[in-house]
């Protein structure tokens, strides 16, 4: 009976959608819900099924194991104990997985999953306070997390209480749309009513923006479901309040709260927050027909797309603040490109497309979707990347879960909703934005796509049911043009692409590749077939010369898929000593047994030896999204294109063979050398040579959130060595989330054979110069452990780029 009820609910949703499509006379572009879009291809359908059968159950298990559900039980008074977890926003992890599970339930009914969601939602509802408030760490009075939320509700802008509310609302709306049940929606409405009562422009209300955005998107979704305009007004308030600092709080680039949105023209701060905020702004602007906000969004987008977008569709270059650096800071090894940020980038760009009909926004969606987003989850579906660098020395590995577990839940809800991005409608006209095999019911029309995209560019679209006069708009992807994204020159293809071809019922039509879409106006009937051929040649890409880390390098791309080279496919497992000449032919072939079935690229390359000799080698590239599915190894997207850009394999040194550690807690002044160094550290002995103290393009160590304190970093060698010199390259650069400077002073200690620490007898001064190595000679010591103890400058943090031993 429940299954029948669910199916009837979905039919109702589709019927409403069909009616809107058939009668709308305006020009607004509307999304086509994923429920009437059914994929049966060999690319997305298996991934969506793995998400349903592996990723979602795995994420729920981790929520159980990590105490996420227990926190709700504790807030409900059902159990006794301590609040678990390290973050005030841990409640959002179950919300996101519930959202993903709801999408999965709508696509394929599962009785056990349906009942499981009922039980979880019942638990969450019991944790809600009578006035609608719901943040468990506050209800549970977890003083251990008071640094986040303070001493009472709504005290701090960065408490994430509104972030919790936003994900609660989005999850509840998804569950209602999927099942027709109001159990979770009623919880969300009660919470949203409290939010709209508490925050706003009136006397007695709190005057500040959302902190971590998502409440804006969420309230817009709730408005669409309920029709209650107070939710739209609430979303509009949070958008308008951003950057105004009405309550006296400090402006913050980190939260895009540094100036009003209408005055913003550069994308800054935390990348996920930016994507969520601008998605919410786009929602409000669309629902209120506010073109001034869209003008501001276009300015910000242009800055992102022309100066801060990674070739994989990722955003956010720095681990510090999980956000953006200055223009053209697109470092590969230290690229953050958080999985959540890539998903947020899709959300924002798709909304920009809906507002404008411009394909450049879908180009960003597709680029992020096939590369950065899919890199965030293993092919097995149970391991995840938090950050997605474009280069690795083998130190990166997907994890089953994280203390800050925002990404796994986000993956589950996003992958389940991928069919949502394939089609859109404008009146009776149909946009085909993404190409994927399957059927879609849009109004009285049933379309069927047949294709092997993204491995093959041939697409057939058949009208299976229905007829009528309307336009079909077929997107011409950015990967067939001179530049991947719009007309900006951040990235440029080195050679022209072949021209796409299109035919209707076997009759060719003209295609202008400079257009966004191939638009076909006609009276359609059952059996009509559109044949589209998007030539998928391997294309080389060069980056703008201002992107320093990409100079004299090339990226390989075929269709929407960015490729990388990985150590497993090279004879010596080393990749940085290879370079690829522009004249070399690159061939593509399908490998059905590799990585679940992928296109691989093969070519001849050159290799630089340790003595400078040049050798011919074979090079294989795989889709970037599939790297690290065969174990840890080196990887790079941007391949050297000149011998000077290739790096010969360095010979091992005393330092390179050492284990590296740093102190976790504070160092006492009386005996700094004895402080425990129990936290793993990295980046200081990887043999990458810094260009300057602000060179953050390669891994480095920094003392996160430490300012003006004594900090340490230590080496533990594979055996005792006699040493008499050390060289330290200090970190120094400015960042909105923390400034890093060379230390005020430092000293070097060694551990003797009896396990006692002593300072070395230095023959030269402990210098703190920047942009160079600081070398210290000392009386030879035989030791298996060395430690630097650094006194940081007052008010500043610090770090080490590279540390050598002789």
Language-model region placement:
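Carboxylate/His-rich catalytic cores and anion/metal-binding grooves
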Residues: 113-133, 233-236, 240, 292-305
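Aromatic, loop-rich ligand-recognition surfaces of beta-strand-rich domains
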Residues: 649-651, 694-761, 767-806
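Short, hydrophobic/aromatic-enriched beta-strand segments in well-ordered soluble domains
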Residues: 472, 476, 527-538, 717
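Aromatic (Trp/Tyr) and acidic
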Residues: 23-111, 115, 146-178, 213-230, ...
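Short, surface-exposed beta-strand/strand-loop-strand elements in extracellular ectodomains
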Residues: 163, 485-493, 498-504, 736-754
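Bacterial Sec-dependent N-terminal signal peptides
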Residues: 1-25
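Hydrophobic, small-residue-rich alpha-helical packing segments that form membrane-like cores
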Residues: 187-276
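C-terminal beta-rich recognition modules with glycine/proline-rich loops and embedded aromatic residues
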Residues: 235, 297, 363-371, 376-463, ...
């Amino acid at each position: 009976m429940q299954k029948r009820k669910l199916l009837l609910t979905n039919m109702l949703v589709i019927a409403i959608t069909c009616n809107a499509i058939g009668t709308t006379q305006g020009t607004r572009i509307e999304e086509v819900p994923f429920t009437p879009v059914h994929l049966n291809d060999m690319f997305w359908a298996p991934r969506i099924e793995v998400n349903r059968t592996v990723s979602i159950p795995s994420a729920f298990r981790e929520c159980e194991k990590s105490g996420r559900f227990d926190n709700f039980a504790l807030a409900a008074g059902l159990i006794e104990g301590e609040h678990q977890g390290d973050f005030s926003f841990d409640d959002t992890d179950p919300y996101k997985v519930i959202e993903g599970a709801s999408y999965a339930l709508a696509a394929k009914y599962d009785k056990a999953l349906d009942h499981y969601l009922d039980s979880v939602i019942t638990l969450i509802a019991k944790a809600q306070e009578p006035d609608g408030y719901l943040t468990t760490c506050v209800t549970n009075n977890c003083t251990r997390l008071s640094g986040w939320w303070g001493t009472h509700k709504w005290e701090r802008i960065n408490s994430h209480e509104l972030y919790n509310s936003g994900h609660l609302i989005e999850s509840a709306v998804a569950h209602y749309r999927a099942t027709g049940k109001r159990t979770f929606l009623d919880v969300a409405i009660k919470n949203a009513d409290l939010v709209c009562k508490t925050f706003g422009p009136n006397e007695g209300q709190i005057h500040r923006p959302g902190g971590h955005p998502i409440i804006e998107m969420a309230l817009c979704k709730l408005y669409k479901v309920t029709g209650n305009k107070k939710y739209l007004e609430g979303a509009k308030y949070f958008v308008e309040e951003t950057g105004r600092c009405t309550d006296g709080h400090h402006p913050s680039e980190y939260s895009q709260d540094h100036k009003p949105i209408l005055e913003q023209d550069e994308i800054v701060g935390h990348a996920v927050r930016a994507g969520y905020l601008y998605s919410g702004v786009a929602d409000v602007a669309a629902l209120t027909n506010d073109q001034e906000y869209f003008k501001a969004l276009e300015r910000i987008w242009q800055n992102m797309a022309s100066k801060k977008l990674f070739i994989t569709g990722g955003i956010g270059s720095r681990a510090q603040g999980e956000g953006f650096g200055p223009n053209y800071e697109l470092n590969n090894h230290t690229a953050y490109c958080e999985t959540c940020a890539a998903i947020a980038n899709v959300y924002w760009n798709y909304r920009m497309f809906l507002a404008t009909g411009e394909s450049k926004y879908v180009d960003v969606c597709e680029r992020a979707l096939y590369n950065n987003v899919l890199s965030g989850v293993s092919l097995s579906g149970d391991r995840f990347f938090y950050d997605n660098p474009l280069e690795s020395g083998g130190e990166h590995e997907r994890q089953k879960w994280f203390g800050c577990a925002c990404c796994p839940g986000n993956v589950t809800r996003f992958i389940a909703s991928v069919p949502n991005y394939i089609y859109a409608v404008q009146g009776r006209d149909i946009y085909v934005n993404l190409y994927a095999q399957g059927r879609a019911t849009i109004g009285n029309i049933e379309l069927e796509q047949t294709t092997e995209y993204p491995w093959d560019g041939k697409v057939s679209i058949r009208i299976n049911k229905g007829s009528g006069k309307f336009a079909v708009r077929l997107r011409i992807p950015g990967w067939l043009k001179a530049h991947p994204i719009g007309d900006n020159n951040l990235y440029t293809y080195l050679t022209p692409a072949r021209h796409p071809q299109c035919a209707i019922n076997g009759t060719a039509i003209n295609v202008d590749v400079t257009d966004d879409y191939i638009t076909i106006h006609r009276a359609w009937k059952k059996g009509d077939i559109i044949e589209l051929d998007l030539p998928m040649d391997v294309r080389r890409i060069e980056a703008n010369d201002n992107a320093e880390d990409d100079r004299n390098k090339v990226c390989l791309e075929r269709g929407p898929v960015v490729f990388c080279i990985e150590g497993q496919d090279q004879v010596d497992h080393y990749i940085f000593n290879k370079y690829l000449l522009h004249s070399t032919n690159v061939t593509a072939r399908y490998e059905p047994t590799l990585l679940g079935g992928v296109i691989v690229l093969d070519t001849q390359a050159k290799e630089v030896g340790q003595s400078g000799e040049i050798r011919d080698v074979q090079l294989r590239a795989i889709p970037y999204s599939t790297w690290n599915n065969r174990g840890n190894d080196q990887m790079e997207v941007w391949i050297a294109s000149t011998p000077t850009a290739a790096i010969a394999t360095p010979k091992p040194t005393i330092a390179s063979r050492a284990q590296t550690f740093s102190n976790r807690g504070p160092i006492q002044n009386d005996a700094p050398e004895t402080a425990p160094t129990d936290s793993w550290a990295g980046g200081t002995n990887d043999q990458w040579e810094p260009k300057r103290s602000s060179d953050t393009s390669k891994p480095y160590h920094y003392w996160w959130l430490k300012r003006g304190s004594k900090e340490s970093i230590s080496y533990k060698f594979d055996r005792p060595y006699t040493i008499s010199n050390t060289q330290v390259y200090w970190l120094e650069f400015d960042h909105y989330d923390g400034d890093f400077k060379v230390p005020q002073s430092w000293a070097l200690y060694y551990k003797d054979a009896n396990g006692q620490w002593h300072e070395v007898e230095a023959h030269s001064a402990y210098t703190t110069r920047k942009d160079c190595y600081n070398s210290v000679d000392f009386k030879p010591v035989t030791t298996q452990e060395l430690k630097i103890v650094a006194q940081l400058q007052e008010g500043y943090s610090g770090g080490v780029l590279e540390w050598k031993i002789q």
